[in-house]
Regions:
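Domain-level recognition of nuclease-like catalytic cores that cleave nucleotide substrates
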Residues: 5-6, 11-18, 83-120
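Catalytic cores of nucleic-acid endonucleases
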Residues: 29-31, 44, 53-104
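Conserved catalytic cores of phosphodiester-cleaving nucleases, focusing on short active-site segments
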Residues: 36-38, 45-54
Length: 120
């Protein structure tokens, strides 16, 4: 049976999807959203970022989807990868930051978002 959301962060469409037996996860259907497509339109550099809060990590099915997307994008002009950004709480301002499982600080996060180093 399709897993119901445990939070209030879904859209009406997302809620509707979960109620449809014709596309239930037991039939093989899964869905996941992607949090950020981050781009510098002046340089053409771009990357994909999945944000997790409260120290959560992507579920196995999400990792599989994200790896599939990363492989499809690999080699595209300006593509700088698919990255997982985990906040200990809700943002860089209220706790630790993990980028691709490595702890960084807010300044390093800004460098990363400017495509100036980390993981790029």
């Amino acid at each position: 049976m399709t897993q119901q959301r445990r939070d209030a962060h879904s859209t009406e469409f997302g809620l509707w999807l979960r109620e449809q037996p014709e596309i239930d996860s037991s039939l093989g259907f899964i869905a996941s959203n992607l949090d950020y497509i981050w781009k510098n339109y002046k340089t053409g550099d771009w990357m994909l970022i999945e944000e997790k809060r409260y120290g959560n990590k992507p579920k196995r099915y999400q990792k599989d989807l994200f790896e599939m997307i990363d492989r499809a994008c690999y080699g595209a002009r300006g593509y700088k990868g698919f990255h997982i950004l985990v906040f200990e709480n809700t943002s860089p301002a209220d706790g630790r930051i993990l980028l691709d499982e490595k702890e960084i600080g807010p300044d390093q996060l800004l460098e990363f978002l400017r495509f100036d180093g980390i993981g790029v």
